[in-house]
Amino acid sequence: MASHDHDHHHHHHHSHDDGDHHHSHHQDGSHGGGGGSWVGEDGRVWHSHDGLAPHSHEPIYSPGDFSKRAPPLISRRFAERAFTVGIGGPVGTGKTALMLALCRSLREKYSLAAVTNDIFTKEDGEFLIKHGALPEERIRAVETGGCPHAAIREDISINLGPLEELSNLYKADLLLCESGGDNLAANFSRELADYIIYIIDVSGGDKIPRKGGPGITQADLLIINKTDLAPAVGADLAVMERDALRMREGGPFVFAQVKHGVGVEEIVNHILQAWEIATGNKRR
């Protein structure tokens, strides 16, 4: 492989209504489809996937505490971007099904728009369109590339752009943002999500809540989905409830079967309660 003697310095600066972000990328002669890693000028380790935009990750030293989670931003201007609900969780837990259920529950009384994240396709957005969740023009699908969690935490501009645009186009009351499926360490930045939902399911067994991770411990609401599968996989819901309450210091969680509508009304109530508190609006 040919060597490269030159350096590349990339500086991106973008500001949001909640503050400024400055990303510095410093790459020393590392090229190629497989990406690579290097130490940036900021002292953080940066990497890229398959030639995609470089990014770094905030170090995570512990699963965190519910009581010490980042609070909603005080400086938020909802006229510029409506109250945003972030929905995260591992692959296959029911994020897109929840997006569909929330759209169906809220669209009659509230102006909604949705942004979905997939790694290399627009499948989740297409699913919502196919099932008539919202008019097609109110749904945007974003391809995040190899690190979907970076798009909801370290470099949120890929999501902020379409969310702000949709919010202004449709005078949205609520925005829904679904992350790409990821691991238990992924969680939304408060600069992107005013209310954070993390969804797991029982198919991984009843050990998942106690494994923790920022999503499980620090989301505003934890959803344990597909409870109807518990007997088939030998998952004990009582154990999951105990561990969820312990890991989340009593923070709220909902047992659900989103596909069958079980628990959806309770989830909607949690969202609207947070929306009322943040915006000063009354539910309709």
Swiss-Prot record:
Keywords: Chaperone, GTP-binding, Nickel insertion, Nucleotide-binding
Protein's GO biological process: protein maturation; urea catabolic process
Known partners and oligomeric status: URED, UREF and UREG may form a complex that acts as a GTP-hydrolysis-dependent molecular chaperone, activating the urease apoprotein.
Family according to the record: Belongs to the SIMIBI class G3E GTPase family. UreG subfamily.
Top-level taxon in the UniProt lineage: Eukaryota
Spans annotated as Disordered: 1-51
The protein's name in its UniProt record: Urease accessory protein G
Functional summary from the UniProt entry: Required for the maturation and activation of urease via the functional incorporation of the urease nickel metallocenter.
InterPro entries: CobW/HypB/UreG_nucleotide-bd, P-loop_NTPase, UreG
A molecular-function term among this protein's GO annotations: nickel cation binding
Basic and acidic residues bias locations: 15-29, 41-51
Species of origin: Oryza sativa subsp. indica
Residues annotated for GTP binding in this entry: 89-96
